[in-house]
Amino acid sequence: MNSSNLFYSNANSTLRLSYGNVKDYIPSDAIHYDYYTTIAGIIEKEDSTNEDFIVPKKLIDLYNDKNFGRYADSDGNLRVNFIDNNDITGGNSGSPVLNAHGELVGTAFDGNWEAMSGDIVYEQGLQRCISVDIRYILFIIDKYADAGYLIDEMTTVSYTHLTLPTSNDV
């Protein structure tokens, strides 16, 4: 180690700010990823023989009952994740994602594989930040964990007012 040298710190313990837009992702010809996923995708990938894809029965039941409550989008779907072109790095997992009005719309948790060079150079066409939609987080707290009392303790913005992620809105 060169203890006498100064190095830029990781995302830990420093204030970082990134901005971007919610966007679909088209990494190559004939491959297109929509800017959001829904709970239907979780159910479609369910595989009881693969530890990474086991879906708890209670979540399957909530899906089958379409018991999404106020967390459903205008089409009645429950969005789980969205992608945007924010510039993130290792250590950003859990960082808040705000919309243009300063409202919490999700939490960043990963980047896409094709943008692994993002720690060295930002590539707008490739770089995507994967975030958990705040509606899914609140749904899990309220409906899955039966901890609605925690939601009651929060000051939340009405979903009729909240500007939720759509293309060009983060």
PLM feature segments, named:
Residues M1-G91, L98-S158:
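Serine endopeptidase catalytic core focused on the charge-relay Asp
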